[in-house]
Amino acid sequence: MVLPKHMRLKGHRCFDFIYKEGSRFYSSSMVLRVTDANKKPQVKGKQSKTRHSIKCAISISNKVSKKSVTRNKLRRLFHHHLSLRLSNMACDNEIWAFISLKPSCMKNPDSTLLKECDKLLTKAGITK
């Protein structure tokens, strides 16, 4: 399952902004970077008119697995999990979240990875 369009984080400027300004939360198999999108410099043209206040992206490196099938399976797993967890969330401001999986994540089963993801989202204050 793919993240709904209104929940996707797109554009290299968004990712650059998250890397420079975002807060980092670490676990043994992933890193969560979170930032408040209202702090970003306004880009001329389009204003953000999203009905959803949380946008996400997931990065899975070739170091995690050389097989694209495995990486895509992990990506789909996380997209499905995030769309279920964050679909009914409402925040006052727009939040951008970026999850990077570490190469050590392949040692863990899927359920453990999803629990770690939930812990990081709670630690970041996105979910309760």
Curated annotation (Swiss-Prot):
The keyword Iron-sulfur does not apply. Its EC number is 3.1.26.5. GO terms for molecular function: 3'-tRNA processing endoribonuclease activity; ribonuclease P activity; tRNA binding. It is an enzyme of class 3 (hydrolase). Transmembrane segments: none annotated. One of its GO terms (biological process) is tRNA 5'-leader removal. Pfam families: Ribonuclease_P. It comes from the Bacteria. Consists of a catalytic RNA component (M1 or rnpB) and a protein subunit. One of its GO terms (cellular component) is ribonuclease P complex. InterPro entries: Ribosomal_Su5_D2-typ_SF, Ribsml_uS5_D2-typ_fold_subgr, RNase_P. The gene is rnpA. Gene3D superfamilies: 3.30.230.10. SUPFAM superfamilies: Ribosomal protein S5 domain 2-like. The keyword RNA-binding applies. It comes from Prochlorococcus marinus (strain NATL2A). This is Ribonuclease P protein component.
